[in-house]
Every structure is written in C-alpha cells, then in structure tokens.
Curated annotation (Swiss-Prot):
<dbReference type="Pfam" id="PF06113">
    <property type="entry name" value="BRE"/>
</dbReference>
<keyword id="KW-0156">Chromatin regulator</keyword>
<keyword id="KW-0539">Nucleus</keyword>
<keyword id="KW-0677">Repeat</keyword>
<keyword id="KW-0131">Cell cycle</keyword>
<protein>
    <recommendedName>
        <fullName>BRISC and BRCA1-A complex member 2</fullName>
    </recommendedName>
</protein>
<dbReference type="GO" id="GO:0070552">
    <property type="term" value="C:BRISC complex"/>
</dbReference>
<dbReference type="GO" id="GO:0006325">
    <property type="term" value="P:chromatin organization"/>
</dbReference>
<dbReference type="GO" id="GO:0005634">
    <property type="term" value="C:nucleus"/>
</dbReference>
<keyword id="KW-0963">Cytoplasm</keyword>
<feature type="region of interest" description="UEV-like 1">
    <location>
        <begin position="31"/>
        <end position="150"/>
    </location>
</feature>
<dbReference type="InterPro" id="IPR010358">
    <property type="entry name" value="BRE"/>
</dbReference>
<comment type="similarity">
    <text>Belongs to the BABAM2 family.</text>
</comment>
<dbReference type="GO" id="GO:0006915">
    <property type="term" value="P:apoptotic process"/>
</dbReference>
<keyword id="KW-0234">DNA repair</keyword>
<dbReference type="GO" id="GO:0010212">
    <property type="term" value="P:response to ionizing radiation"/>
</dbReference>
<keyword id="KW-0227">DNA damage</keyword>
Amino acid sequence: MSSGQSVLKQLHPLIRPYAETVLRKGNVGVCMGNLRISDVKSGRPTLTQTKEPCGDRFKIYIPFAGDSLKWEVIFDSCQPSNPPDFIFLGENGNFDPDIEKLENLTHWDPKNPESLVLAIEDLMREYRCYQKQLIEGYSRLQFEYSSLQGMEACDDVEVHMGNRLPGTLDSPVNFLIRLPIDLSPIPQYLVKDDPGEDLAVLLAKFHNSEGSRVTPQLFLSPKVEHALGDNTALRIPRFPTGGCLMDYVPQVQDFLQKQIDHIVEGYQRRREYVAAFISRFGGSVLEYDAESFTKLSLVLEWNEFFFVLHIELPSRFPQDMPVFTFQSCYHLSKTNGEPYVSVQKSYPYSPRWTGEEMAHRAKLFILDFIPQFKKVSVSSNKL
C-alpha cells in the first residue's frame, strides 16, 4: 500500500474525496509538483466511539519556488460539509490572506470533490502576491523580479522568502523560473512510460539581498533529463559576478536550445542513415532499432560465404562514425570460442555526407573488406 493510500484510509469517508483529488490532481506552481499529505489526526473527543475513520485534519506539503510549504488543513468530521480552516506553519505564519478573495472557500461546494484543490489554488494565488510584497523592501530583489516582467517567463516566476525583520535577510531567497522553451521536438522514444508534462525550470538562489552570491540550478522533467542528462552531465553557464537574471535567463535558454537542437539533429540523422541502409539492403535486414535508430544488423552473402554485419551508431553521430562489426556465421574465435568477429572503426566517412551517400560508401567498403574478413575467419577454428 502506498503512503497516499494509507493516508486516505485514515480520513472520514466524506472528507476523503477532497484529499484523494488533491493527491491525484493537485499539481501547482511553476514546477507542476505533486502535493503531499501526512499526519492525519482527528479533532473529535478521545472518548467518542466510531465505526469508521474520523481523521479530519492533516498537513499538506506544497512545492513552491524550490522550497516546500507546510500548511495544516482542518475539517470537522462532525460537520464534514463545512469548509476547512487553514493554518500556515513555519515561515508562513504571517501569511494572512483576504478571505473575500478566496472564492472557493467563501462559496464552498461540499458536493464537489475538487473543492479543496480549488481552494488551495486560490490560496496559492494570494501567497504569490504575499511573496511579491515581501521583496519590495529589498531593492536588488525587487529589481530582479521587475526585470523579468517584460520577458516571456514573467507569468511563470515564483519568488520565496521567509519571515524576516524589515531590512534583514537571514536566509536565501529563491527565484524559480519556468523557461519558455519548446521541448516538443525531443523524440518520444526516450521515455516509454508517461513522464508527465515536459518542462525546464531554473532555480536561482540569492544568498544575500545584494546578489553578490547567486547559485543557479536547472531542473528538468524526466524525458528532458533523459535526453540531455542530469545536472552532473549538463553544465549550464555560471551566473556571472555582478550579473542579473534578466541577462542570465536568456543565456540558459540559448544553452538548452543548442542541446535540444543537437539531440534532435542526431535523431533525424540516425533515422535517415538506417532508412538508407534498409533501402539498399532491405532483403538482408536481420533487425534494427526502430525507436532510437542506434543499431542495425544485416545478414549478407558473398560467394556463398554468409556473415552478419552489426552497425552501431554512437550518441555523437554523425560527428562520430558508426562502428561496423563483421560476425562469421561459420567459425569460432580461437581465443574465446565465440563466433569470430572483426570490428572496423576506420573506413571512408564524412559527417557531411547524406544518409544515402554514407550507405553507398559503406557498401563499397564492405565489398572491399569481405575477402580479407573471409580469409581470416576461415583460418580460425571451424565448427
């Protein structure tokens, strides 16, 4: 049983649908992160006897600007149709939204299982406004946020700072920016399961109000990360000393766009290459990778000598040339007792050639190399 299912079983049956919808549909904020529920309790007197679960209050964790907000949601299991109360825990204690702006709380619909999700969305809208007000006392932070307003990403920016005395900055302030970049060209084969929405978000952590130290970090959705690599493999530009987000965000966007273009071009060139070989050797194709187009195997015959040609396309194709592995159908290697093979990594090749030209040149090389391969293969141990 998952932790979410365990939590739901503890809730009053009439409250459970609200929490179930939160766990299933509660994706909020720039990163579209899932909400999490824990610490289910009951507000009923301890002597009350019930035959059903009576949990009616719980903590909810909301991803926001690289942090996690912790709020407490309080229903009344004796009157489960009433709207819940909220307690904003930790650094959120001073958050005091105007109840008149929380339409889904003031007009609570107990029959709608999405009512709690809608109420949380209202609260998050007011919380974002609250955070914008907090940074107004810090000129550098206000400048950074204001400078993003004219960019495409202005509607997808979260800023988070905790409660601080006026004019002080005791802990980092986070800017979380969803980068407005088209990720749809990334090939679908990279992640087979449903990985959710494709996105790339930039977290910029300001360690002080002057911005003298800023730490950037890039977060990618599963398919995008699988294609481009994680943070250890994908080195985004450093945040320059004295720089600002208005200049830095476009640099990261350009960097990502180049990586995506490289991935897409490589995929298209591999597909073109494999298609050219299938066109020339259609009847000889043993198998090929129809998703990522990284492998191709052919069964070939020359003067009644049969062999298998395995072709592997490297990740940096076409910059790096494919590897040809000739495998005998008759003879075993003297060293390991396996089918004799000859690996060829050097032959006429240019990354500027089309797939058709590569297949044509490869065919000429294969015909030229077969006699040599047959001679060495025959000289090995026979079956």
